[in-house]
Swiss-Prot record:
GO molecular function, a single term: ATP hydrolysis activity
Family: Belongs to the ABC transporter superfamily.
Gene3D superfamilies: P-loop containing nucleotide triphosphate hydrolases
Protein name: Putative ABC transporter ATP-binding protein VNG_2317G
Length: 232
């Protein structure tokens, strides 16, 4: 379980997240949407301690993130918008191995984690290829594999479809469906609900740093325009 409790985050005098509470159950897919500047990216960056709250807290499996940052980051994987800016290895395998190596895991375990993660995103035969030579969709899948190699309970993806053409978007979406079916919790941040509508167990719409709407996709669809969100 990932729990956000009365979270507040400020950038100077601007309140980016204002008293937000949200629970994400094991195996659930929650889609967080809203216009630019609504606070959705700031919210999810608290989920594994990338940001510190001004008030409130985030708990991962019952433990506040700030009390055990290493455990939180092992449990909550992050895939950032434009992940190609954050690749740390020249090859696919080196990039995916980076996280487990930093955990100090044995080489045999690292190799197994890398193999499992690449298989999960259907890049098992691409381990020795240069990340820079891959397509945008393939690079997105490498970023997902790098997060999966940490064997997280929850996977947070910030605008995972940005800049991808239609076939690449569908490829990434297929991988997310498979991960969801296998029991991985997903928190997907997007301003465009068309790709993830059928994937979501719940939709959370943010506006001005607050949750304006939340619920099952079928229940909230008609109210999305009132929350400032274009329906799919």
């Amino acid at each position: 379980m990932l729990s956000v409790r009365n979270l507040v985050h400020r950038y100077g005098d601007t309140v980016a997240v204002d008293g937000v509470s949200l629970d994400v159950a094991d195996g659930e897919c929650v889609v967080v949407t809203g216009a630019n500047g609504s606070g959705k990216t700031t919210l999810v960056r608290h989920c594994n301690g990338l940001l510190e709250p001004d008030d409130g807290e985030v708990l991962v499996n019952g433990t506040p993130v700030g009390e055990d940052l290493v455990a939180a980051r092992a449990s909550v994987g992050m895939v950032f918008q434009n992940p190609r800016d954050g690749f740390v290895g020249a090859t696919v395998g080196a990039d995916v191995a980076f996280g487990p190596e930093n955990l100090g895991r044995p080489r045999e375990e690292i190799d197994a984690r890398v193999a499992d993660a690449l298989d999960a995103v259907e890049l098992g035969g691409r381990r020795d290829e240069r990340v820079a030579d891959l397509s945008g969709g393939e690079q997105e899948r490498v970023a997902i594999a790098a997060a999966l190699a940490m064997r997280p309970d929850h996977l947070v993806l910030d605008e995972p479809f940005t800049g991808l053409d239609w076939p690449a978007r569908q490829s990434v979406l297929d991988r997310l469906r498979a991960l969801h079916a296998a029991g991985t919790s997903l928190i997907v941040v997007t301003h465009d609900l068309r790709d993830v509508w059928t994937l979501a167990d719940r939709v959370v719409a943010m506006r001005d740093g607050e949750i304006a709407l939340r619920g099952d996709p079928a229940d909230v669809r008609g109210a999305l325009p009132d929350a400032g969100v274009r329906p799919p």
